[in-house]
Amino acid sequence: KPNIIIPNIAVHIRRGDVNENNEKRYTTNDQYKEILSFLLEKYPYDTITIFSEGKIDDFHELQQERVHFKLNDSIEESFHSLVTAKVLVMAKSSFSYSAALLNQNIVYYIHFWHKPLKNWKIL
């Protein structure tokens, strides 16, 4: 059975197949830095787990206390963690969107072509 973590706050950062040349699908680390600041202030007792692809050096500006990284994990483990997170911040991706549809807790939505559900919070 996979080693599944249930994060307090899960942030999906889409990387791998997208980069800064694809504005419609890419959210910069600076934008995520603002999101993390908001989350750390709003949820002062929770930790944040970032789910993404790449090397830890790709996220140097996001590294701080209470922020952990799960990079290059299996799709199944990452998806399950996003679905079960107490707070989920979606990326601009159908993968994130699918997890958000199944997540029964708090979901934060970053605007892209899939429309948010009424109970999601817009970032």
Predicted regions and their residues:
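Secretory-pathway luminal glycosyltransferase catalytic domains
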Residues: 1-43
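Donor-binding and catalytic core of enzymes assembling or modifying cell-surface/extracellular glycoconjugates
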Residues: 38, 43-122
